[in-house]
Amino acid sequence: MEPAEHLFRQEAGRLVAILTRLFGVHNLALAEDVVQDAFCRALETWKFHGVPANPSAWLLTTAKNRALEILRREGTARRFAPELGRFLESEWTLAPAVEEQFGTGAIQDGLLRMMFSCVHPRVPEETQVALILHLLCGFGVAETAAAFLKKADAMEKRIGRAKKTLARSRRLFDLSGDDVAERLPAVLRALYLLFNEGYHGASAESAVRADLCAEARRLTSLLLDNPRTATPAAHALAALFCFLAARLPARLDPAGNLTLLGHQDRSSWDAALIAEGRRFLDGSAAGDELTPYHLEAAIAGLHAQAARAEDTDWAAIVSLYDRLMTIQSSPVVALNRAVAIAERDGPARGLEAIACIDDPGRLARYPFYYAALGEFELRLARPGRARRHFRAALALARSPMEKHFLEGRLCDCADVSPAR
């Protein structure tokens, strides 16, 4: 990504959040237009005068001046943010009110309010994540569509419908209200899905989207900076993200191929992120609620503390999966538990655990279900069965990297002699 593109993506969310607070969420399109105008002016100006020492401040000032111009010109013709209306109606209070919205504290507050607005209960879950990516992370419609393997025109319609839903509320979510705790789980879920899209993504270019993982971590840090949203569950989610992000440098080999956890070069794991994850996990211990994020973070933490794959405490991991199944039973969690059982007790026990999964039909389109079956059969020296499962996984692979990995496992089947 070009430096300017990276900067614009980084600043887009902040600017859209600030301007939406000023204009009102019903004028979201206007806020986006002002941001786009600021970026266009930057490209034109910087081309001749060079990039300023503080490009972020330059963009903020440009957007602020444009916002003031619009508010002065259309103050009586258009309805702006209801909660700022009395300040925006007078020239004496207009400039100070706008200036206040561009302060650091107001920017952070605006980003949080926008995040909570994006998970409006009438917006479908996958669209909530797409909306966060689009509005708060600066991803264009085409980029957002690519992240979810959707067509750009379909994603544009989906985002458009979600924006109309937000517009009907006329104002951003109020963080001082009593429904923060009610909507926070949806925010955490959206960030979890965003990170997951990066970590287990199906991009045509890469099986890993570190940029999506980084955005999920950045937005989670905003939650931890606000006392109303810095809950134990938010700390647990931050811990999970840190532990998993620490492994990203080893998740692909130098050729860009997927590397399984057991074969990763653990010396390349990010020790600072692992330490940060431990601090967040400690912070998640407050309170008396045990969430799936706590258990997933604890599992990832056990992997992170194992210096070698053979040092992994699989018994403890199976125990954590057992607890996870009691509060969030799903076929995918059950499959992960089966993999842990296979590591603890051997592949035959792993196959037995898979056979006991409730509603296995929900895994029928999940490539890693067949990949796990193939791995277990290969370890049991049954290459014929393994080959069938790997072929089924290959047919469902979502990216060239996944296909390449599974093709490699198919080739490995030829090197295994059938058990007698």
Which positions does each model-derived feature cover?
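"A position-specific structural signal for the A-helix of alpha-solenoid helical repeats
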Residues: 237, 241-244, 296, 300, ...
